[in-house]
Amino acid sequence: MGKVVGIDLGTTNSVVAVMEGGKPVVIANAEGMRTTPSVVGFSKDGERVVGQMARRQTVLNPQNTFFAVKRYIGRRYNELSPESKRVPYTIRKDDVGNIKVACPRLNKEFAAEEISAMVLKKLADDASAYLGAAVTGAVITVPAYFNDSQRQATRDAGRIAGLEVLRILNEPTAASLAYGLDRGDTETILVFDLGGGTFDVSILEVGDGVFEVKATSGDTQLGGNDFDKKIVDWLAEQFLETEGVDLRRDRQALQRLMEAAEKAKIELSAVSITDINLPFITATEDGPKHLETRLTRSQFEGLCADLLGRVRNPVKRALKDAGLRPDDIEEVVLVGGSTRMPMVKQLVRDLIGIEPSENVNPDEVVAMGAAIQAGILAGEFKDVLLLDVTPLSLGLEAIGGVMKKLIPRNTTIPVRRSDIFSTSENNQNSVEIHVVQGEREMAGDNKSLGRFKLYGIPPAPRGIPQIQVAFDIDANGILQVTALDRTTGREQSITIQGASTLSESEVNRMIQEAQKYADVDRERKERVEKRTRSEALILQGERQLREVALEFGMQFARNRRQRIDNISRELKESLKENDDRGIDQAYADLQDALYELNREVRQYYAEDEDDDLFATIKDIFVGDKDKERDLPRDSYRERDSYNNRDYGRDYGRDYGRDSRPSYDSNRPPRKSPRPSYQDNWDDDDDWL
């Protein structure tokens, strides 16, 4: 039987760990290092090198050496920012809009999943050599804020590497496993994970073997590389000002700048000033040029002020979503090499008010947590319960473009949620299920994850068919959507994978815009609902007039039709012109007109009942001989049929006033009423 390991697939570095003797152990790679650079390169001979060997050739072979591809995995080219495209190698868009990295040495293009698979393969091979047995399975960690497609792409990378991916685990959750496995008392912790390319913050309750995530937030396009780029830009701007040459346009010079920036960043975590010397960085007509300068810690912190602001916001959002104050946090666990920067530690102190824990290795704790999860799946731990959450709300598009949320963000997974929907048109034989992800009220403002159709719905008036839509999120965070016609039993489903994905900038924009434009979203939603109610009231009026004409004759209906038709026409014009005030006025007038029609019908019934009472008394005293002469009118029986129809159903549900009586009569019918359309639609049900 093959071995199972835990892998932290990082943007900058990756780590592999395994359970030994009931404890997680980090496995050193073939070069003797406990961390492996997430770098893949191809030498002059076309040989593939991974890890530290690939990193050594980045300066001399920048176009054929690929790093930080985790930022591209599961994403589309049009989602990349100009900043994320600024790397020494070439990024291209394929025919379907996905991201490819070009390798001139092999005259070939690779997907980000393929490059990541090469790193995973290196880690698995090194682990196999250490364990003396083949590694066949893995628990792989991803940022908590990775969306569905990014998680699926990570799983695909594992499959390409020949691994069975047993679980996709959120990085902060993995860190909490390694931190709190042996802790008995329950405490509330905040995991602050700032890695090379991603940032996550999660709040958990940990203790007695239970790890429950309360809230998560983050930014998958923020990490240590962004702090490096601040130094790169500072150096390049200085050189451009003094020498008139932009080093960022030279691939080799750019790679040297990036290496020097990372080195300076690391040194400034221990000292207050560092020297940066890059001899022969470029050459002009005047000869070779050198870059020599000094950078202080205070200068570096000033350059990164905006990045610290981006770090601060997710922490506040996670606290708000969890319903906690900073003083409710009992422990802060720092994860990721970038948390070693003094300004980051100080930011955590300022936000939470306590000293961060130094009990775990920020580079290794995530892989150790992944190994523990592998042990849980293998049955090595019997009394450990892990409750993770989904980072963004999931729902579908309802009538009018409104997003109907089925699974709110920070819902514990695995989870299944369902709701009942119906058709929006008469005799509609199919419905389209449009799955969206985000926090805005309107579906068009959120991210589309996929679409599929359910066919074969029996013809019926709008609102009568019942379509049950179910969302299932498994423990890996992978979403499956199922639609079921409850009348016919027909079912259609889709697993959301390979769809257009969310960039972190889009995620942050969705949440920020949802807060900024909450009032605007609410007004738009109310406007759509008002339009839907108005259109339904117009249809109700037309239906009632037809029924009245059938029961009482055209003359009775004609006297009342003109007013209702005029008001309906005004309401339609107001809807066409988007005149909110006109819609409100015409809607109220139409309600009144239909109420008056209802009142007259009930009054007509009351008079009919009085006539029947006198006829009964006459029969008692006179006998049956007058019946042949004075036969009852057929319309009497027909009126009872009309009376027992549920005309007040829609009216009482959406449009009626609570103080007004119903159209229904409790008097038993004299004969079975003529069949009419009925439905059992609830107030909370929505129309697709």
Swiss-Prot record:
Keywords: ATP-binding, Chaperone, Nucleotide-binding, Phosphoprotein, Stress response. SUPFAM superfamilies: Actin-like ATPase domain (SSF53067), Heat shock protein 70kD (HSP70), peptide-binding domain (SSF100920). The modification Phosphothreonine is found at residue 198. Induction: By stress conditions e.g. heat shock. Residues 630-688 are annotated as: Disordered. CDD domains: ASKHA_NBD_HSP70_DnaK-like (cd10234). Pfam families: HSP70 (PF00012). Residues 630-661 have a biased composition (Basic and acidic residues). One of its GO terms (molecular function) is unfolded protein binding. Disulfide bonds: none annotated. PANTHER family: HEAT SHOCK PROTEIN 70KDA. Belongs to the heat shock protein 70 family. Acts as a chaperone. This is Chaperone protein DnaK.
